């Protein structure tokens, strides 16, 4: 994108072409399987001269890359956090499996606080009741009381969980990493919201479209004027069904093409 930004700053008409298009266009020009830098340059130049409907890349599109970078960065961070949460579930199953039936979900602040301070059934069983009850009450903002702390401790005393210091240390470190990711994701989302407020897109007026999903859709699609029908947007996202027909043979079990942006597919599925 450095070269792209440089060309735009110089006011030069700049075009961005889908590599899939150039590859198919190159194959249509010759039956030979020749691919060199010289051939690629000739193919791109030929496409630019023959495609009268090709639109130049605008400065607005370039700055849209900032939003794309943020939404993709957030996507990767959330995916990383999800893997860590899976690790939490695995470690709890080893150290104190009974707690899963005592709370709505493991992945809440009060449970993380408890497991970070007492990373295992043995530690909870040996904890002083006053300290334990104060911790769960503060971490849950009053939702959990002394009775809850007693329930946790009694369950820990008869737990089948293993006493493994190495796993307890891993659990503490994993919780710490999740907290760090939570803070990073929140910071990224704040930056996304700032850009979305500046754009003021009507996409947010659609029921069910949040800042996060709306931002991802806008970032991946860019300029909606490039698409004159919903079908083209679906094709761009790789959500169109693949089609095979030859003579009287017509495939009846079409699969999604899954070409294009996987981030856009995710956003459209989850919007």
Please provide the spans of the model-predicted regions.
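A detector of single, family-specific signature residues
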Residues: 1-271
